Amino acid sequence: MWLRQSSGGGVASAGHGGPLRQRPIDAATDCDPRACYDSFCKHWQQAFEIIQHSAPPSHDDVLGVVSHLDYMVTLLLVELHHCNKVSLPAAEASGPPAAPCLEFLLSENLLDKLYEWACTTGRYANAVRLEQLKLYELLVSHSRHQLLCHEPFLRPLLKILASSQGEIFPPDLEKRLVILLNQLCVVLMQNVHLLDLFFFSAQTQVQEQILNGNVAPPKSGTTTNFIIFSLLIPYVHREGSLGHQARDALLLCMALSQKNSNIGTYIAQYSSICPLLVTGLGGLYSRLPNSIEISSIDWHRITPDDVTEIPELTLFMNALEFCNAVVQVAHEMIKQQLLDFMYQGFIVPVLGPAILQTLKGKHFQTNIDSQISAMSYLDLILRSITEPGLLRAFVRFLLDTEKFDGERILDALVERLNSPDANLCMVTMALFDTLLGLHCEDLMLELLLKFMLPGKHVPISHRHKINKIDPYLNSSEFFLDLSPDVMKRARDLARPKSVHEPVVSDLTPLPSLPSPVMSKTIGANWNYYGVHTGDSLYANIQAYLFEAHWRIAQCQRDCLKWANSYRYQKWPRHGQGRVHAHALELARQFFSEFGGGPIAANETSEKQLDSLQSIGESSGYESFKWRPADEESEATDTTLATTASEADLDHNSSSLSSVLGASSKREAWRTSNNNRNELILTDLEFSEDLFAQGTVSLGPFLNAIWGKLQTFTSNSLYVNLHLTGLITRLAWYPLPLIHSLLLRSDIAITSDTPSFHQVLRILKQQIDAELPVTEDSLEIIDVARSSLIDREFRLANARKGNEGSPMHHSQQQQMATNSGQQQGQLRSAYATLSAATPVQATPTSAYDPFKRSDNKRRSISKSITSMFSRKSASNTSTTPPNGSSASSGLSQIYAFFTGAASNLVGTNASTDGRGMSHAQTSAGTCETSLSTQPQAGAPRTGAIATSATASGSNSSIAGSTLTLSAQSNTTTHSASTLHGLDGGPSTGGFNSEPASLDSVASMGIIASTSGTERSRDLALCAVLMDEWLKELAAIAQEQSVVLVTEQGSL
């Protein structure tokens, strides 16, 4: 135990030259119990003679007593070390005591006499108090709880603790005091029945000290005091080990409040811990950097490595994690008080103004940096906290309209999705990815569902399909067909065909295209430069399916805890509920009087009615299987529809009651605060307006997302990574409304903006028009794909390298107890997936961009070939630390795709259409990548497509869009780095390799070629879109299975 080592070390190091203190204390042959007892008594006798002096003690007197106490502590340590059990004075019936020195200490009240003398030592009081604390620390650590039951030990201990309140001690004395308090908390946690020993009336205690002549008269209004907790409060915000030990002890006290209501009442009503924690948290937040230094082009969130590198952020996160732990373990009164103080004293007055920053004067760039830092801090907070109470407070903060003059924080965040600044846009999308990962009902309602529930964005003829999932609909094929033609052609060339296999292609064969052979960048073994890529997830549909199944199941579990089930229903207009109920009652009376069992007959007639082809629309409603009046044909029997609606209305009313009754038992922070009836009648307008078709809005959030998606080919690569990841996050929700919007190709959408499927078709047409299927286009696609795959393995290798770091080991030790088993299951699952991907042969490609001698090359291929030949002739390459050759053309190709060549030749600083900045430099500074490590419990998936998602939580790396996208988690909270991933500085292209001058000239020619920059952007977009569509196809397939299963259980 570290406590025992600390106490032993402390005793051994505080001596004044005594020889016994330097010798081993566990050698049984070195000490005679009788001799130890005699020596102990002799030392006390000499010390007591000094104590009995009537004059104030001098310096020599204090040194003498401290020296004797030093020897006494050593003798006690020797005795206790060899005693298996501490013998108490009252327990000795016969025979010699097992611990005679300890018995003498208690029977003669040595501790009480020592305390009384220490109060008279004046300026030497701290030195004497230090020796006393060492003595108590020794006895508590070795005797556990037995001595606390005896007054000769407990009484002077309470006295010295009470006298320490409000005092300012030197560091060594503070350290000993906090260690002693920590030990007492551990003992009390194991022996809760001793808690009342440390509750004493301050009035009684002070009066008792007045009788001894020690302190001034007490103040009026003194109450019961928990002395241990009171002494720990001043150290709650201390740095270093002292603060950590104090916070650990305070958490033990908070946990004790769950077992003893007196502790909880005292902390909540009489202590100042809650306002102290909140004010300290606000002060630490104010010390955070106003702008974060962004060292890479793809930076989008704060990682654990960033926290350790910024001391102010480390202190803030320590305080935040302590507040989260207090809410987790404390008494309900303490928890509620802390949450109220957090919301009123930190979240609203501190975070609110920091996030709602606006442009002021000429400080636009500074303001953008401040917004980025504030949103990054909010994202870090949401990923770090785990308690539902705190999460509920932050959700309330995002949706509050009263605290900020009618402006909601959530609306301000949505507006920043349209920001032209790439960094602000990526940080905003990363924040929304964290928010969507919370699976919170209120957030989803405000962002999406309240705009989709009326169903006005779907034509009337298609609305019956929203809740009804067709098991034979192949949405996966729809998404695969949206892949750009150049990507389809590349797949056809990469697919090894059998001799007897007919060639089926929807493309017109081009005579100039090469023969259908496999490219070196396709398959599971892209190892042209010696990099093992057998575990590549590129184009691994099994990995996509596994990831989709895992994510959808996780999301479904959380959504089952919601208060409302969000399915499309046609609700009555305002004020029509009573009219409909009255009409139904009249119909019931009519059929009961004249019908003679009409209900059963009507149910049979309804089944026959639903079987008609022309009236199939009404059968699609899952909630109400009756035909609304405004959708019925004139030939429909009104009586049948009315009777059927009555039966189903009663059924749905009972189902709604059961849902609302069970919602109180679910996680409150995930569930909505709105009652369903209030939501329907007050917040949402479900009236049917046929003239509103084509002008219905899906809400500002989806409009912003669709707007960004429409500029897909002009966005930067990293913005597109986060954008596709965010849409994929939405596609994981197993809700029919969201499923019909994103993954249903058979449902038309009529809104004021193009639908998701329409935008995808437009992007396909744009890429097909600007990047036709030619040999040069296939070469560019091949190079783009190779660079993305290479980055996937570079990130994977960086993760493996980080796994060997001490920081990673410490983090893994903390996560091992919670996620070891789950990680093992995921690794085995992915090992199966990797094994299922066979290693393929890679025959030479006729359009291989790495081939050095081919006279048929045109445009880009000629430039690459000449570049390679000049590179080989120069023979000036060096070998980088990662083992890949710097003389290879890979770094130059990466520079070609990142625009670094123009920088290397000294071009002016510019910013391309995708938002990538190019600095004016001759050293060649290029973009760096962001390495991330997978969170516990989250699989690594996505081929070159993994999402930029967090967890959190709970946030994790396994997700949607490319492995190039970076992410961290959590909440629970993953480790990543924002600097160079190859062990060197964060400079260079994708491979962080230096470029030579002769290669610079070649790259300058390529970069200046007309259309080259646009072509490379389109190539990256095509590869990204192709992989994203594969992932959407996998999600659509898994969602259909989940929703069809759910539909069958209704």
Swiss-Prot record:
Residue ranges with Polar residues bias: 808-826, 918-935, 968-977
Keyword Ribonucleoprotein: no
Compositionally biased tracts (Low complexity): 872-888, 941-954
InterPro entries: FHIP (IPR019384), FHIP_C (IPR045669), FHIP_KELAA_motif (IPR045668)
Keywords: Phosphoprotein
Modified residues (Phosphoserine): 498, 805
Region of interest (Disordered), ranges: 800-827, 865-888, 911-954, 968-995
Pfam families: DUF5917 (PF19314), KELAA (PF19311), RAI16-like (PF10257)
Annotated family: Belongs to the FHIP family.
Name this polypeptide is given: FHIP family protein GE18198
Organism: Drosophila yakuba
Source organism phylogeny: Eukaryota, Metazoa, Ecdysozoa, Arthropoda, Hexapoda
